[in-house]
Amino acid sequence: MKKIALLITLILVGLNFNGFSQEKTKVFTFKIDSDIDPRMTRRVSESLKEAEKVEANLIIIEMDTYGGAVNDADDIRTMILELDIPIYVYINKDAASAGALISIACDSI
């Protein structure tokens, strides 16, 4: 038991020392929470541009969609793949059809 407590303490102390040399991470979030259609494509495009503008280090998409138009999903997928900022997706209930295609393009699900 004492060994486990010592190990946890060492890990926490190590994390604190590593934190001094790191820059603050800017996380940009937005939702995909309706049908994948031209309006959602515009919304995602504007969100990704805003993330670049604020110099975000990470983008998190909260997704809850049953899908939609595959051509719009492909446009969103292309935007995600071409962006240099890592993008994580949090699937909050559903990512069906076009939503799954978009999720797979992200760096982490």
Residue ranges of model-derived segments:
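Sec-dependent N-terminal signal peptides
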Residues: 4-13
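Soluble extramembrane regions of membrane proteins in the secretory/endomembrane system
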Residues: 19-109
